[in-house]
Amino acid sequence: MITRVLITGANAGLGKETAKQLASNSEIGKIYLGCRNMEKALAAKLELEQLTGRSIFEVLIIDVSNQVSVVEAVQRLDCSVDALIMNAGGTGGKNFNKINSNGVTEIFAVNLLGHSLLAQELLKAGKLLKVAIYAGSEAARGVKEMGMKRPELPTSSEEEFAMVLFSKKHKMPLSHTVL
C-alpha cells in the first residue's frame, strides 16, 4: 500500500494536480511537495489543503537542477516515501542551451540528472520503498517559445528516453517498480 508520496515540481501544473488527485485517496497519509521556491510551495500547499480538505501536504524545498539541493533535500526528508513522482522539469525556455556549474545544460540537469541523483540518494538512504515514476511532459507537447513542434518520436525527448533507460537499469537489481 502506498501511503507517503514525494512529487517534484509540485507547486504547479501536473505536479500540483497529481498531489490533488492523490489526496482524494484516503490511504495516502502524506504528500511531500518537492518545490524549489518556498513562497510558491506554501501557496500550493494552502490551495491544496483548501481544495482537498486534508492537511497531509508538507513542503520539501528541492531544486533538482542543483546536485547539492537534491542531496540536502533527501537528508531533510524526515521519513521514507513509498512513491517518488519525478515531475519537475521543463524546456529551459529561451535559454535551453545554458550550461550550468556542472558543465551540462540546465534542461538536462533538471530533466534527467537531478531526478537520477534524487532516486539514487533516496534508495541509498533507504527512503524510497516501492515505486518511482518519471512524469516529464513539456517536450511531449512541443514548446512554441523554442520554435519546437510536437515530436513524432516514441519518446518525447532525449532526456525522457535517458530516464526510461535509467529506470529500466535500476528495476531488476533493486526489486522496485519503476515506470
For each predicted feature, which ranges?
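Rossmann-fold NAD(P)H-dependent dehydrogenase/reductase core
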Residues: 2-179
